[in-house]
Amino acid sequence: MPEIDVENRKETDIWKFETTPRMSSYLLAFVAGDLQGVTATTKNGTLVGVYSTKAHPLSNLEFSLDIAVRSIEFYEDYYGVKYPIPQSLHIALPDFSAGAMENWGLVTYREVYLVVDENSTFASRQQVALVIAHELAHQWFGNLVTMKWWDDLWLNESFANMMEYVCVDAIEPSWNI
């Protein structure tokens, strides 16, 4: 959730954030570090940001930012439901065992699935787009609407698996996904 106040103290600072909507505890995430990022706003006003360590130039985050913004806009139009919270932040983590995790409003990724440079192949760009679209699909299937118990996790994953292709095909039709 967006930061609403920072109290600067002598040895430590205190950050206050907007109250989150009700959510499953497994969707909660915090990230702290010396990060840099790029941001944009969707046509409906959602702040979208892509962040990494300073080991990567900011230009390596632009592709992912563009895909994230267009994916959110696609899903809002497709579902007829606005993105449910005020921001969508995407963080490239240098040592992350999972491929990505759809924490609500703070999606975490292995660096290879978010950082794109001038040497990235077309196939790797497609893979990055699919992973971003997959994680953003979970913001509706799995986060906004959460299954009652883990037995039904397959529903979250199957919807996200299908929708990543529907989304990327819609926002990048020349790719013939």
Segments (PLM) and residue ranges:
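Catalytic Zn2+-binding segment of zinc metalloproteases
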Residues: 136-151, 166, 170-171
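Acidic/His/Gly-enriched intrinsically disordered linker/tail segments
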Residues: 157-177
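Hydrophobic helix-coil surface modules that form long, contiguous segments used
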Residues: 1-133, 162, 174
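Acidic active-site catalytic centers that drive phospho-/nucleotidyl reactions
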Residues: 134-135, 157
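Active-site metal-coordination segments of metallo-dependent hydrolases
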Residues: 61-65, 149-157
